[in-house]
């Protein structure tokens, strides 16, 4: 599928998410955060993300995971390559190291000992769209795609897409390098994808 078709799809899916309204996203978000708690284990390293715009917020999950002793990590984008490292989720009051303004992605970056994605047990992946085969449509930055593709043969982390029901479609366009995720959690429940 050509880029302009992907752009149109992103626009459509973002519109659907926006049309849920603030209260709708809030209620669905609480349900999703509750469902995500099944992945919490003491000492388990879990990659989360910093939500942008109307992306699903993980606040409830983060609080529960911290309380129960899981180790949370946020993406740290290398300025020159498109690959991500992961740094420990900041304790309250920790100042962000820098803002990343390139490519319209204003993601706070935090200092700390960096690990690669294969050091995580679980990685929650933000989505613009998700299909029933486990393929995702992202923000178009390519950061998750590049990171997962580079770790393809070493990837121990379970990759879970998180988002709203309205972002789930039957099929999405895919590129040869795209890797399917292991699952998707929305307000309707948990989908597990079998890839064989």
Residue ranges of predicted features:
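Conserved phosphate- and dinucleotide-binding cores of soluble alpha/beta proteins
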Residues: 82-196
């Amino acid at each position: 599928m050509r880029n302009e078709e992907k752009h149109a799809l992103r626009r459509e899916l973002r519109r659907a998410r926006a049309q849920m309204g603030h209260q709708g996203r809030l209620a669905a978000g609480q349900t999703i955060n509750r469902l995500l708690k099944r992945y919490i284990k003491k000492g388990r390293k879990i990659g989360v993300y910093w939500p942008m715009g109307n992306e699903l917020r993980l606040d409830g999950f983060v609080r529960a995971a911290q309380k129960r002793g899981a180790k949370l990590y946020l993406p740290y984008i290398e300025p020159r390559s498109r690959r991500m490292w992961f740094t420990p989720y900041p304790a309250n009051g920790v100042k962000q190291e820098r803002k990343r303004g390139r490519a319209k992605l204003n993601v706070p970056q935090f200092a700390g000992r960096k690990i690669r994605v294969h050091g995580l047990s679980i990685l929650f992946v933000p989505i613009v769209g998700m299909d029933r085969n486990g393929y995702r449509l992202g923000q178009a930055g390519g950061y998750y795609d590049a990171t997962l593709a580079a770790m393809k043969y070493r990837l121990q982390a379970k990759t879970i897409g998180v988002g709203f029901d309205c972002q789930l479609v039957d099929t999405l366009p895919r590129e040869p390098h795209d890797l399917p995720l292991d699952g998707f959690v929305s307000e309707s429940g948990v989908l597990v994808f079998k890839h064989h």
